[in-house]
Regions:
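An N-terminal domain-cap segment
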Residues: 6-44
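Short alpha-helical hairpin
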Residues: 1, 26-35, 96-104, 139-146
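Short, contiguous alpha-helical
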Residues: 37-90, 127, 134-182
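Short, helix-capping/interhelical loops that line the mouth of catalytic, cofactor-
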Residues: 1-13, 60-120, 182
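Amphipathic alpha-helical packing segments from all-alpha helical-bundle domains
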Residues: 27, 121-132
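Class I S-adenosyl-L-methionine
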Residues: 19, 26, 130, 175-178
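Alpha-helical interaction segments
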Residues: 5, 27, 35, 111-112, ...
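Hydrophobic packing residues in well-ordered alpha-helices of helical domains and bundles
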Residues: 11, 18, 47, 118-122, ...
Length: 182
């Protein structure tokens, strides 16, 4: 997927980090055969369930941002110091090696979709997300557009940064799964 040329530098940088994180995620994901992809360790998710979880989270995030901004960006609240601190805290939490339960707002992954199905769906989602982000006027980057279950409301810059940290958080999980099934 090409990097974006139309976003301002700050959002473009965060988007590119998210794109790069997905490439790193795919490096780990491609180490799984089709059978291994669905093999579920006794103590956790399969690689398929991790992908389904991340895809569900990103799908929900984009859907929330679209709905929240559908009445216009001017009516949205601006980012406060509290929003900044809470965003930093959730990203620090995701950067830690600790395991956390997925928020209850997300469905439990089913382990039934193929790798190719999910990658295709993820590619379509990322294209849609890129289009959405490109259409945001940079004067609205400080508007609160997404409610993250732990951090609360985030602006678009914080949301893309959160998705980046969320995706990176699951890369070691793929490595653990691979070591448990090999």
């Amino acid at each position: 997927m090409p990097h974006i040329a139309t976003m301002n530098t700050e959002l473009k940088s965060r988007w590119n980090e998210l794109v790069d994180a997905r490439e790193e995620f795919f490096v780990e994901l491609n180490k799984f055969s089709d059978n291994q992809f669905h093999s579920q360790p006794t103590d956790g998710w399969s690689a398929a369930q991790v992908v389904e979880h991340v895809l569900g989270a990103e799908t929900g995030t984009l859907g929330y941002m679209k709905k929240k901004s559908s009445s216009g960006w001017d009516v949205l609240d601006k980012t406060s110091e509290e929003n900044i601190e809470r965003s930093k805290a959730v990203n620090a939490r995701l950067a830690s090696p600790e395991k956390y339960a997925a928020p209850s707002i997300l469905n439990e992954p089913t382990n039934q979709y193929s790798k190719s199905q999910m990658i295709l769906q993820w590619n379509l989602l990322r294209t849609d997300m890129e289009k959405f982000l490109n259409e945001i006027d940079e004067t609205h980057y400080d508007k609160l557009v997404f409610r993250q279950p732990v951090a609360g409301m985030l602006n678009v810059l914080q949301t893309v940064e959160f998705m980046h940290h969320h995706l990176r958080h699951h890369i070691p999980q793929l490595r653990r799964i691979a070591s448990n099934i090999s």
